[in-house]
Amino acid sequence: MLFRSLACEPLKNKKKPRVLVGGLGMGFTLKAAIDTLSAGAEVVVAELNPIVVKWCRGPIACLTGGVVDDPRVKVVVADVAAVIRRAALPGRGNRFDAIILDLYEGPYEGDRGRGAYLYGDAAIERSCAALKAGGVFAVWSEEPDKAFEKRLKAARFSVNRQRPGRGGRHAVYIARKTPGPQARES
């Protein structure tokens, strides 16, 4: 089963799931989410590059059936970390049932590297705060990363690592927000 399907599978029976997809790319992750989720779903896609959005609405729209124009989809040209930060603010009613990060750079950068703003301790805690109870935090990674798994568990996620596809080189983390007080919010 592909990462895209694994990420939304826990939400397939939810009537109105709210999902954040980090990165549009060619639209395949978005397409899989839309195909898995109910008609009442809302999928917010955060894409940094407006040209990518233009391509997905134009020359490569046929690859995904024009999924970016599905009425359940809202595309924002923004950094996914900023969208997560806003959703994590106390008192906000815009938390997500799932956050899916299918980005070029995965968590292998560690807590202090370039990816810390998405995969470091504080970022993971923000993602947890941006999720509803039982929410899913799904992350694609170039390879397994034990330190990332440890950071997920420290933020009170239950973690399921999969190795989908041929060869099993890449890792997919499906982390569920567990009940109870979460780690400190930043």
Task: Pin down the residues of each PLM region.
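S-adenosyl-L-methionine
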Residues: 1
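The AdoMet/dcAdoMet-binding core of the Class I SAM-like
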Residues: 4-131, 139-142, 155, 160-168, ...
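Glycine-centered, phosphate/nucleic-acid-interacting loop/turn motifs that mediate DNA/RNA or nucleotide
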Residues: 135
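Conserved active-site alpha-helix within GNAT-family acetyltransferase domains
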Residues: 147
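C-terminal lobe and adjacent flexible extensions of AdoMet/dcAdoMet transferase-like proteins
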Residues: 173-186
